[in-house]
């Protein structure tokens, strides 16, 4: 583990060395070529510099005075023309990383009086959030009290409110990144649950009141442990981790590693599970290291000609965040020491289960995870709602998310592996929620997952009352998948169009792990078993040169679409079925 800690610190040093020159004299950050700043880069830089100082106690790096750079970036974030809760929260914890009392904090000493007053005012101002922004409120509160800007500590109250919202929004105790839109379906259970717990735990570690930290850790543990139990089942043999929702890719890897290492440091993981979690961290890290790090120059790449990511993240933000995480991992690993000795490498497990995130009279939401070591088929099938800013994407659609095998374009909507039905101005998809979600073992040990939608829902996440209903049945046997969709309408209605798309991608030409899964020459081996809509396969569309068809890991080259583009009168009482099967030819990227 000591060697791992040093490796993390060396990587952090390399990444920071490549990015500190981007900090301007006024503390703003110059972007990578072909990117624009988001206004939060300075805060992320400040926190990364602070974490590096905590890990090394060094105040210079490659001739840069880290104290001056931290002061500059914190000042820039404090006076950012637009309000950025995240950037401010990161900047405030960056300040706190250099010392919890302002009279002993070298960065506070360097801040001019207008900056101090601005920080005091901004850290006091906060809105009440139901989503992951509440974690930023907690970070700001920790900084304000610990630095000594306030004698009243609101951190405990804010953490209690964060946990209460989890109870209100999830019957199973998972974090719903609720947005302010009230007319759409809630239930955005994604990686922001993990990242929120990681951020809050990191903030508490910097809190001046150790007693408060210990009191609140017990409350946080009851919820965070749910993700700790989930993550090992999500990680593929090639190390690919969280694979659905927004902001995954490198962040899916980094957040998953962080929450596991934090839990090991805090003793939340049983010693009997040391082999499982050590193996999980190793796989996640190796995938992260090879897939996202430029080995020659030592910096992170999350967006280029072949891959893409969430528009709220830039390569510059990702580099500072990666440096911060690596410094954090180095400290955590040293703190863990030999408390979790690993004796054996666990054998690959066969996994097939549905994790229920929320169940009420109105909806059920969750995640079906599947791994078959013999065939290499591994995927995550989400039944969750999209965040309002990600409605026009495939990130939350209910299909088997399996990077390299069943892929989808980032920041672009299309009906990947689900039927899309258009009735007038309403576009219907069987995603986002279900009722009567069940898993069972059928004939010949076939694992089945099914759910119903008594009310159809639009791709925007709004219930389409009065049109009809849908039943969805998935069946899995080794490396083979069958899916069936059964639609019924409440009264005669005209269907304008139905379409169903499949994406064929390739791994990144440079940044890829040789053992990552990808499609072989025989592709998906897709077959239409039943089609009451009488749709036809369109000519395969070549999209290799279109920048809108990039994934987190590589480029999509072809789109195959099954479509009926002329009207069909659907009649009450008749079931309309669409059934397909897949048996993907899975191989290694460098086979």
Where are these predicted regions, by residue range?
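Low-complexity, Ser/Thr/Pro/Gly-enriched N-terminal "stalk/linker" regions
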Residues: 1-65
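Short, recurring structural edge motifs at helix starts
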Residues: 31-34, 78-79, 126-128, 184-185
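Extracellular polysaccharide-recognition and catalytic grooves
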Residues: 110-351
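Extended polysaccharide-engagement surfaces of secreted carbohydrate-active enzymes
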Residues: 237, 241, 252-538
């Amino acid at each position: 583990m000591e060697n791992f800690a040093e490796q993390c610190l060396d990587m952090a040093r390399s990444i920071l060395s490549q990015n500190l020159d981007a900090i301007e004299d006024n503390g703003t950050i110059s972007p990578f070529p072909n990117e624009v700043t988001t206004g939060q880069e300075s805060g992320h830089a400040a926190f990364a510099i602070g974490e590096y100082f905590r890990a090394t106690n060094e105040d210079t790096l490659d001739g840069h005075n880290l104290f001056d750079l931290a002061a500059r970036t914190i000042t820039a974030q404090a006076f950012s023309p637009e309000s950025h809760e995240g950037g401010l929260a990161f900047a405030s914890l960056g300040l706190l990383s250099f010392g919890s009392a302002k009279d002993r904090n070298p960065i506070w000493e360097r801040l001019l009086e207008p900056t101090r007053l601005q920080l005091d005012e901004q850290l006091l101002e906060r809105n009440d959030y139901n989503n992951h922004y509440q974690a930023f409120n907690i970070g700001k509160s920790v900084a304000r009290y610990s630095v000594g800007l306030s004698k009243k500590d609101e951190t405990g109250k804010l953490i209690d409110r964060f946990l209460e919202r989890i109870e209100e929004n999830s019957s199973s105790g998972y974090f719903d990144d609720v947005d302010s839109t009230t007319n759409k379906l809630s239930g955005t259970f994604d990686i922001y649950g993990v990242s929120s717990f990681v951020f809050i735990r990191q903030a508490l570690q910097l809190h001046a009141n150790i007693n408060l930290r210990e009191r609140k850790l017990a409350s946080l543990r009851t919820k965070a442990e749910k993700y700790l139990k989930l993550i090992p089942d999500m990680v593929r043999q090639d190390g690919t981790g969280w694979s659905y929702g927004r902001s995954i890719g490198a962040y899916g890897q980094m957040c998953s590693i962080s929450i596991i290492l934090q839990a090991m440091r805090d003793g939340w993981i049983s010693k009997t599970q040391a082999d499982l979690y050590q193996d999980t961290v190793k796989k996640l890290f190796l995938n992260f290291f090879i897939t996202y790090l430029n080995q020659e120059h030592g910096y992170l790449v999350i967006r280029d000609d072949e891959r893409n990511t969430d528009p709220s993240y830039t390569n510059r933000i990702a580099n500072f965040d990666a440096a911060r995480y690596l410094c954090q991992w180095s400290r955590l690993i040293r703190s863990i020491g030999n408390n979790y000795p690993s004796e054996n490498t666990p054998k690959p497990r066969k996994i097939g289960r549905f994790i229920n995130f929320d169940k009420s009279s109105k909806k059920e939401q969750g995640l079906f995870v599947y791994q078959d070591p013999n065939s290499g088929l591994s995927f995550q099938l989400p039944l969750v709602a999209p965040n309002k800013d990600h409605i026009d994407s495939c990130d939350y659609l209910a299909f088997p998310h399996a990077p390299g095998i069943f892929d989808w374009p980032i920041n672009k909507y299309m009906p990947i592996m689900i039927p899309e039905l258009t009735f007038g101005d309403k576009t219907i998809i069987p995603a986002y929620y279900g009722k009567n979600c069940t898993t069972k073992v059928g004939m010949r040990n076939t694992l089945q997952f099914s759910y119903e939608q008594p009310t159809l829902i639009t791709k925007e996440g709004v219930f389409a009352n009065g049109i009809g209903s849908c039943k969805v049945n998935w069946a899995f046997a080794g490396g083979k998948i069958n899916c069936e969709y059964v639609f019924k309408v409440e009264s005669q209605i005209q269907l304008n169009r139905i379409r169903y798309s499949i994406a064929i991608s390739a791994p990144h030409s440079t940044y890829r792990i040789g053992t990552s899964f990808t499609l072989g020459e025989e592709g998906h081996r897709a077959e239409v078993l039943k089609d009451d809509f009488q749709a036809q396969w369109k000519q395969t569309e070549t999209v290799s040169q279109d920048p809108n068809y990039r994934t987190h890991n590589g480029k999509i080259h072809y789109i195959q679409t099954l479509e009926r583009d002329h009207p069909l009168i659907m009649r009450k009482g008749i079931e309309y079925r669409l059934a397909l099967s897949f048996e993907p030819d899975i191989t290694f990227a460098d086979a």
